[in-house]
Amino acid sequence: MQKFLSNQNKLFLIFSIIILQVFLFKPIQVLADLPTGNAVKDPNAILRNALPIKQVELQEIQHKLEETSDLVRGGRWPALTKTVTKCQSLLKKYQSRIIKDLPNDKKKIAEKTFLELKENFDSLQDHSKAKDKYSFVSTRKEALDKIGGLEEYFLPNQFPYDIPEEFDDLPRLLGRAKVNIKTSKGDMKAIVDGFNAPLTAGAFVDLSSKNFYKDLPINRAEEFFVLQTGDPIGEAIGYIDPETNKERHVPLEIRIPDEKETFYNQTFEDLGLYTETPTLPFATLGTLGWSHSNTAVDDLS
């Protein structure tokens, strides 16, 4: 588990939606890496898009490469070759501009990464011409991981969003963390996004560090839809803060792309944003989220 920030001797960590990468029984990697048909449902793409950065050129390369998802699934090889050629062109066009915008201590490692990306793109061109789907997918993942790593170099030095003072007593995660989840059926790895849900993610990682979830059973399972856990043994239905002897509640957090601030304890209906998609959409396979009651949005615990 990675710890990011602390304040007033309390570990500040969090969550509202987190993306899981599941490795049960170590399946064949190329099969696990097959991209989904829609980038909005690809957890890795969502995490890249959710970074609070504005690096238009690098993100253009990312999005162009992600466009190959539908093409590779449909076996549209001529279009795939053309898209890879466009990626190569964008890389050559933007490389010096992107490196120039980086902090000085990141420039040399970025230059090396760009050389590796060029090799990846050359390999993708070869794989598309050979109609080698599995090699294409594997190399594509390597390239996107490198692009995501470059994007992280552009993260701001300070947390970019305000959190209301009324939640000062709650743990928060001002960044991202990795959490290992062990189950009787195998292990899972979760990437917890505190940029877009600092209080939810912070509470989740805080409870994880306290072993709150240890030995808790899965108390709800709906096939191909959802698994639920977190109901503690005894009468309590949530986490009881030992300092107050009361159930700790975490507010509902929603971030919407291009909105300046995070919304707290307001639903899309409350905001009148009926057609908007949150930065961290819940309809993605592998998403981890907290449930609240039918009567309140601020009783996550």
Describe each PLM feature range.
Residues 19-20:
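…; additionally, a secondary subgroup of soluble metalloenzymes is captured
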